[in-house]
């Protein structure tokens, strides 16, 4: 006991221990669940919660704040209600609902939260950008007019209802009329641009579809080599209504990631009718007042704020960098000249385009492609009704050669439909009417195009020139498509330079002379 403990040593040890204490504390703002059911929960105690903020439940389930009331917060669950009960603790994340995006998502199938659901493992999110799901659309000053075409590879669309990069073009029609087919063919047609090093990145948003339908679509895109530049966002029919509601916003956020970095992107919303139904379901459960057809009053604003995010961004770098509502992570990475094109799809009931949601979306978009079940059943596919289909801004984006050869095609087709209807009542026709009907029938056959066979724009110009100039008047109607294939094979092998020139927008007498001579040689074989 000779060694006495010195007070100075004790104080030194205590001092060292005190200095090593980490006194920083983390405070989480928490609330408790009042009630839960039907994919919605009410939380008490989150006085500072923000609209669209992410909340986290004890069991890891995430939710998004939708209703801010005096004494509670209404939120929609992004998962199952299983395991969530009254009194459970919920904490604020202080993050607005967002999705993490990077190039590793290309070729994958994800849910609206950005999680992979294709069974290929997690996506490497190194260097990912945090893109908000809901974001203000670019103001007028940061946009520029639509002037570059988005080639769909579909003759009837590229010639009569052209789509430009940055446009919103609605695809509308009854169920089973080929709406998705037009969107998928457009995605497949971007393969040549991707291989040429000028990619148009595609985002396909599947809302409320069967999982088997989505799997079949992914398989088709794989077979046609379209997955390397495509991302599929899927909220299937088995997912909660909230996931179906947020799926298009996730697709738009991914599209903005490419758009704001100077690339071109295409987003397909298939379909917004189901999103509106999901929003109606969530709103009614949250006891929001309902309006026409029981949809909430702001269902127009739901679609307008989503579709306004499609834009062509100003080429001037210094202007693009000042873009409104730019996410923090995107600052310093913005490049001008990018575009986001939207192809929303709406399903009508018995061809009624005057219903609430169809009229809303028609008034928001820059034109519509109307598909008719009667035409589809007659074998005219894509079943585009030329009379009420229109593109309000795409005409200025058409290449010169296409604009010149297809300028009268839409009027000619509408005139043919009208005359054909009258011809059923009258057997005797004058020569001009008979010729108009004959040419119309042949043009109808030219515009028929099987699914998954998009056509390069140069070939489209060549064959439409032959149709509009009556170069196939000697060919029987039933042989027109066969004649078309023979003609295109001959032009591809013997006059590839002509196709290339037409694709670049050139058209002159020397080029048309080659087309006329080639068609004369081919049509001669079919002369009656």
Give, region by region, the residue ranges found by the protein language model.
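P-loop NTPase nucleotide-binding/switch module
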Residues: 88-90, 97, 101-104, 117-167, ...
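Acidic-enriched and Gly/Ser
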Residues: 2-17, 23-26, 32-150
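Nucleotide-state-sensitive switch-loop elements of NTP-binding domains
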Residues: 200, 210-254, 284-296, 303-308, ...
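Phosphate-interacting basic helix/loop segments used at nucleotide- and nucleic-acid interfaces
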Residues: 13-24, 152-157, 251, 306, ...
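Conserved catalytic/coupling modules of large nucleotide/cofactor-utilizing molecular machines
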Residues: 274, 281-528
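Walker A/P-loop NTP-binding active-site region of P-loop NTPases
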Residues: 165-216, 271
């Amino acid at each position: 006991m000779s060694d006495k403990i010195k007070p100075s040593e004790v104080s030194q040890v205590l001092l060292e221990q005190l200095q090593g204490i980490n006194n920083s504390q983390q405070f989480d703002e928490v609330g408790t669940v009042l009630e839960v059911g039907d994919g919605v929960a009410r939380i008490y105690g989150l006085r500072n919660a923000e609209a669209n903020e992410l909340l986290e439940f004890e069991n890891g389930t995430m939710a998004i704040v939708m209703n801010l009331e005096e004494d509670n917060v209404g939120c929609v669950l992004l998962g199952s209600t299983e395991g969530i009960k009254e009194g459970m603790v919920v904490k604020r994340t202080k993050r607005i609902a967002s999705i993490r995006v990077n190039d590793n998502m290309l070729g994958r199938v994800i849910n609206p939260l950005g999680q992979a659901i294709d069974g290929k493992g997690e996506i490497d999110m190194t260097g990912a950008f945090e893109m908000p799901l809901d974001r203000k659309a670019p103001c007028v000053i940061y946009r520029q007019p639509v002037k570059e075409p988005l080639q769909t590879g579909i003759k009837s669309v590229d010639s009569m209802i052209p789509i430009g990069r940055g446009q919103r073009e609605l695809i509308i029609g009854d169920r089973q009329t080929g709406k998705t087919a037009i969107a998928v063919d457009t995605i497949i047609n971007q393969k040549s641009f991707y291989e040429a090093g000028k990619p148009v990145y595609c985002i396909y948003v599947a809302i409320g579809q069967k999982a088997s339908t989505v799997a079949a679509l992914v398989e088709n895109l794989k077979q046609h080599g379209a997955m390397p530049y495509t991302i599929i966002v899927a909220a299937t029919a088995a997912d909660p209504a909230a996931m179906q509601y947020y799926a298009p916003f996730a697709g738009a956020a991914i599209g903005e990631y490419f758009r704001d970095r100077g690339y071109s992107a295409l987003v397909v919303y298939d379909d917004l009718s189901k999103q509106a139904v999901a929003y109606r379901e969530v709103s009614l459960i949250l006891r929001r007042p309902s309006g026409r057809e029981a949809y909430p009053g702001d269902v127009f604003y739901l679609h307008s704020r989503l579709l306004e995010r499609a834009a062509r961004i100003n080429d001037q770098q210094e202007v693009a960098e000042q873009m409104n509502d730019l996410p923090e992570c995107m600052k310093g990475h913005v490049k001008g000249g990018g575009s986001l094109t939207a192809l929303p799809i709406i399903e009508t009931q018995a061809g009624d385009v005057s219903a609430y949601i169809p009229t809303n979306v028609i008034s928001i978009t820059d034109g519509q492609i109307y598909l008719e079940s009667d035409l589809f059943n007659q074998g005219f596919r894509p079943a585009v009704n030329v009379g009420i289909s229109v593109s309000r801004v795409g005409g200025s984006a058409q290449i010169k050669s296409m604009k010149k050869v297809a300028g009268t095609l839409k009027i000619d087709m509408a005139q043919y439909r009208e005359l054909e209807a009258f011809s059923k009542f009258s057997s005797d026709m004058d020569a001009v009417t008979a010729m108009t009907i004959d040419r119309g029938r042949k043009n109808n056959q030219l515009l028929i195009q099987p699914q998954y066979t998009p056509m390069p724009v140069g070939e489209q110009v060549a064959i439409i020139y032959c149709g509009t100039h009556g170069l196939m008047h000697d060919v029987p109607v039933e042989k027109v498509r066969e004649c078309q294939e023979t003609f295109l094979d001959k032009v591809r092998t013997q006059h590839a330079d002509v196709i290339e020139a037409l694709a670049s927008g050139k058209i002159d007498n020397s080029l048309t002379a080659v087309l006329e001579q080639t068609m004369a040689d081919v049509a001669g074989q079919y002369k009656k």
